[in-house]
From Swiss-Prot:
PANTHER family: TRANSCRIPTIONAL ADAPTER 1 (PTHR21277:SF5). It comes from the Eukaryota. Component of the transcription coactivator SAGA complex. SAGA acts as a general cofactor required for essentially all RNA polymerase II transcription. At the promoters, SAGA is required for transcription pre-initiation complex (PIC) recruitment. It influences RNA polymerase II transcriptional activity through different activities such as TBP interaction (via core/TAF module) and promoter selectivity, interaction with transcription activators (via Tra1/SPT module), and chromatin modification through histone acetylation (via HAT module) and deubiquitination (via DUB module). The gene is hfi1. It comes from Schizosaccharomyces pombe (strain 972 / ATCC 24843). This is SAGA complex subunit Hfi1. One of its GO terms (molecular function) is transcription coactivator activity. Keywords: Nucleus, Transcription, Transcription regulation. GO terms for cellular component: nucleus; SAGA complex. InterPro entries: Hfi1/Tada1. Its main location: nucleus. It is found in: Nucleus. Component of the 1.8 MDa SAGA (Spt-Ada-Gcn5 acetyltransferase) complex, which is composed of 19 subunits tra1, spt7, taf5, ngg1/ada3, sgf73, spt20, spt8, taf12, taf6, hfi1/ada1, ubp8, gcn5, ada2, spt3, sgf29, taf10, taf9, sgf11 and sus1. GO terms for biological process: regulation of transcription by RNA polymerase II; transcription initiation-coupled chromatin remodeling.
Length: 339
């Protein structure tokens, strides 16, 4: 393809007084007589390549079909050189392409890539813009606000004041991508479980387990609750109630004895329970264990508030060496009985 006519021959042709359009027309007529009926395929291939619809590789594959004909390379190179010369002279791609004889376009198109439909749409847009700009500032602002897109998800108004404890979605302190719907259902089941103040009785093992599971999930413990946890809590609750009643009996021991002397059938009534809680309202509070109570008995009342637990007995409480073994045996026996 690179062999053939040189640039000097093209320049000599233009220096003889011939116009560039006349020279390129003669070359194209020679190419048409050479190719015959295949000239239309050649013109379509070159036009598509010049406007960017064909790549260089595709163009070369199409032109290889005409390479066997004599003088084809010379005429093809002459056409390319004249096109480049016109482009450099006019410095306008579109005007150079319009000099090609086979390049026919409609007069309504102002440029190479401008279609009639696009030009009509641009004219309609310019007309609408002229009408809008002729309006007042307030009207233009109203049109601008009307054309704004609305948010996809409207903002939710918090209804915390209207929600109940059961209706609210429970909050679990874990990331949302790890949230399981089973956890939410377990927490709701714990909320629905009846309270002891509502049933006026000790909770059963199943309802207590549901409440323990809900509280553990709210605090981030997602591993579940073991089977015997609710039974141990019920046993501790019964022991605590037993200690409260024992405390009430010790308070009203004298009153109960007087009733027994007057009436052999006398027992523990609601009035006695009310009297015991009136005398000592802190009877519901669990007492200190035996080991924590001992240091308070071993110190005087004028000591400081912050008292450390004595690991060993004070020196003034120690007996003589002769009776030390007997006292230690008695102390160990008392510890076993009190525990």
């Amino acid at each position: 393809m690179t062999e053939g006519v040189t640039v000097q021959k093209v320049q000599s042709a233009s220096s003889n007084g011939h116009k560039p359009n006349t020279v390129i027309s003669q070359i194209i007529s020679e190419m048409q007589s050479l190719l015959g009926s295949s000239f239309e395929v050649y013109t379509k291939t070159m036009t598509d390549f010049l406007i960017g619809q064909l790549s260089r590789k595709e163009m070369k594959s199409m032109l290889l079909t005409f390479a066997g004909k004599s003088n084809f390379d010379k005429l093809h190179n002459s056409i390319i050189f004249h096109i480049l010369k016109l482009m450099q002279k006019n410095n306008d791609t579109f005007s150079a392409l319009h000099h090609l004889p086979w390049f026919k376009r409609k007069k309504v198109d102002n440029s190479l890539f401008l279609h009639k439909k696009i030009s009509s749409q641009n004219a309609q847009v310019r007309l609408i813009k002229r009408i809008v700009m002729s309006l007042s500032y307030k009207d233009r602002a109203r049109i601008k606000t009307a054309l704004k897109e609305k948010p996809v998800t409207p903002s939710l108004i918090s209804g915390l004041l209207l929600e109940t404890r059961i209706a609210k979605l429970p909050k679990i302190p874990v990331s949302r991508d790890k949230l399981n719907s089973v956890f939410v259902n377990d927490i709701k089941a714990g909320y629905v479980a009846p309270l002891a103040c509502e049933t006026l009785e000790l909770p059963d093992s199943e309802s207590l387990k549901e409440r323990i599971t809900a509280i553990s999930l709210e605090n981030g413990l997602l591993g579940g609750v073991q089977k015997g946890v609710s039974d141990i809590i019920l046993a501790g609750l019964e022991s605590h109630l037993k200690n409260i009643l024992s405390r009430c009996f010790s308070i009203l021991n004298k009153n109960i004895r007087q009733k027994n002397t007057e009436n052999d059938a006398a027992g523990f009534t609601i009035n006695d329970l009310n009297l015991a809680w009136t005398i000592e309202p802190h009877a519901f509070v669990e007492q200190y264990p035996q080991k924590l109570r001992m240091p308070f008995l071993l110190h005087d009342s004028y000591t400081e508030d912050e008292i450390s637990i004595c690991a060993e007995s004070p020196s003034y409480m120690l007996a003589s060496n002769d009776a030390q073994s007997d006292r230690n045996s008695v102390a160990s026996l008392l510890d076993e009985v009190l525990s």
